[in-house]
Every structure is written in structure tokens, then in C-alpha cells.
A protein has these predicted regions:
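A short, N-terminal "cap"/entry segment at the start of jelly-roll beta-barrel domains
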Residues: 1-88
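Conserved short histidine dyad/triad with adjacent acidic residue
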Residues: 72-78, 92-106
């Protein structure tokens, strides 16, 4: 996907989420300079794989086969072993009208 397509999907999703009465965390809107200046804060975000995720499942046609996700919270498998910390994930998922999300697994 082209960066311009990804940016447009992110803008549309952000608008839709706000219109639905939900607000993404501040890191959703950080610039590259923000990420650089907040390296300590950013470590958990990166290690927990939180943030934007836009996929066409490798099919090359997001409008037909795609999914938008924003991960707000994500636990670690280590937390399950100790039954402490974040034990679940919290994701916002958007599928457009007539868009398919192929069966997949993680």
C-alpha cells in the first residue's frame, strides 16, 4: 500500500472513532520527533505492539480485503504466567461496508 493510502485510512478512521465518542490516546498522534523525544515512554508502546495497524492481508486490495485496527492496550504472555499486569488486549477494529476480513490466525 502507498503511504498516501495509509495516511488517508488513518485520517478517516480517526474521524470515525471521534464521531463515535471515543478518543485515541495521545501517542496515536505523535510525530516522529515526539517518538524520539519520548523514548522511555515509547518503549512500552513499541514492546506491547500498540498503535495503528492497517492490513490488506497481502492481497493488494485494501478496499476489498482489509482491516483497520488500533491497539490501545496489549498484555504480555508473561503476564498470564504470573496472573498480574495487563491480561488482555483492547483493540478498535473497523471494517468498511462491503469490505471482507479474511479468516486468519495469530
Amino acid at each position: 500500500m502507498k503511504r498516501s493510502e495509509i495516511n488517508a485510512i488513518m485520517r478517516d478512521a480517526s474521524d470515525f472513532i471521534r464521531q463515535s465518542g471515543f478518543y485515541l490516546p495521545p501517542f496515536a498522534y505523535w510525530t516522529p520527533a515526539d517518538w524520539a523525544s519520548k523514548a522511555d515512554s515509547a518503549r512500552e508502546i513499541v514492546e506491547s505492539q500498540m498503535g495503528w495497524d492497517i492490513t490488506d492481508f497481502g492481497h493488494g486490495n485494501y478496499e476489498q480485503d482489509g482491516l483497520f485496527l488500533f491497539t490501545v492496550r496489549n498484555g504480555s504472555p508473561e503476564n498470564i504466567k504470573t496472573m498480574s499486569g495487563k491480561l488482555y488486549c483492547e483493540k478498535i477494529m473497523i471494517v468498511d461496508v462491503n469490505q471482507r476480513t479474511p479468516m486468519h490466525f495469530h
